């Protein structure tokens, strides 16, 4: 107990810090098997190209989830590869929308992959707790699970992986963070 030397009032009791729910960053692990990956290859790296693509997808009522853009200056022509995920039922429609934009936007090709899953760890304060993403990636690497895309927010870290590894990844993350 820490007390004032100027009076006899009760002081403050100082004790060892106890663990609380705030210490538990990850509250859940999920696997979404209903995702598909779309990549637009060789999109000229110019203002407005990505906006045109995502506006067209939005007008077709296609929800886009994770987005990754890789810029390249190979051959002296700045281009980008744009990869994103959509719900599997929207994949065919997304492909048609993109093909309708190919001549206008000048990209090389579109590829799709339905054999992916999205594994997420969910909790409060992901950004304010260092090492959560590193631990997630280490757990997945130890299981031989390759990460294709990564997305982070204040409450969630998600990765796109091969669908065949989904259950194994989810179990390993559950064991690492929740048991």
Language-model segments: which ranges?
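C-terminal catalytic "cap/lid" subdomain
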Residues: 1-152, 156-179
């Amino acid at each position: 107990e820490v007390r004032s030397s100027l009076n006899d009032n009760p002081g403050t009791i100082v004790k060892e810090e106890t663990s609380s729910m705030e210490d538990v960053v990850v509250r859940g692990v999920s696997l979404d098997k209903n995702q598909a990956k779309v990549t637009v290859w060789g999109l000229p790296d110019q203002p407005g190209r990505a906006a045109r693509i995502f506006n067209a997808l939005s007008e077709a009522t296609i929800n886009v989830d994770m987005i990754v853009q890789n810029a390249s200056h190979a051959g002296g022509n700045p281009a980008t590869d744009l990869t994103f995920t959509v719900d599997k039922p929207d994949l065919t429609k997304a492909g048609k929308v993109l093909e309708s934009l190919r001549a206008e936007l000048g990209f090389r090709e579109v590829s799709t992959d339905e054999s992916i899953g999205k594994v997420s760890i969910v909790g409060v304060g992901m950004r304010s707790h260092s090492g959560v993403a590193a631990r997630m990636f280490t757990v997945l690497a130890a299981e031989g699970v390759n990460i294709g895309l990564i997305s982070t927010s204040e409450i969630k870290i998600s990765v796109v992986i091969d669908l065949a590894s989904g259950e194994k990844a989810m179990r390993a993350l559950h064991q690492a963070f929740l048991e």
